[in-house]
Structure formats: C-alpha cells, structure tokens
C-alpha cells in the first residue's frame, strides 16, 4: 500500500480493521462523524448532533482507546460549523470529551 497510517473518515471503523492495524503495525486516526450542527447535506449527521455527539464520541473513545494502533482522535474534518461564530465552542466541547475520556 505504501503507507503506514490510515485515517478513517466520517464513521467509526469496523473492529476488524482496527485489529488488523494493530497486528500489522499501522497507525490510525479515528473519526466519528463528518459534520457537527451545520449541514453539509440535507440528510446528514447535523440532524442528530446535539443529541448524539457526546454519546458517539464517548463510544468511539471507549471502544478504541486501548488499541495500540490508534494514535490520534479526530473531532471532525471540513465541518462547516468550524467557520461559524460558535465553531470554537463546539470544537472545545468535543476536545474536552476526548481529554476527559482518554487523558493520555
């Protein structure tokens, strides 16, 4: 493949992929969702963000925090909210969850 790291994007990865990365020595960055509370598309995660974001982040962190291949958590990629006046508050909210659940 010519790489040593894998970024999963927009959804939690299959456990089998994480186990394979552990076995093969790949590093992983895991990301739980592709948008926050501002829509990228009409039927996106923004519809559920306020209710589910913390639970989904905690679930991701608890599921994969002990896998040696996981070297980084992503709180989002190219999310429209980051450019809004409250974007930094949402980013801080998600960052705080990561630090609370995985203080390493």
Task: List the predicted regions and their residue ranges.
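Active-site mouth of glycoside hydrolases
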Residues: 1-104
């Amino acid at each position: 493949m010519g790489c040593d790291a894998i970024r999963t994007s927009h959804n939690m990865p299959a456990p089998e992929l994480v186990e394979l990365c552990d076995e093969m020595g790949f590093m992983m960055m895991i990301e739980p969702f592709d948008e926050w509370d501002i829509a990228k598309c009409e039927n996106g995660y923004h519809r559920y963000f306020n209710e589910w974001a913390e639970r989904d982040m905690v679930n991701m962190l608890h599921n994969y925090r002990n896998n040696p291949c996981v070297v980084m958590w992503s709180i989002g990629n190219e999310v429209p909210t980051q450019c809004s006046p409250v974007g930094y508050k949402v980013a801080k909210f998600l960052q705080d969850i990561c630090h609370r659940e995985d203080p390493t």
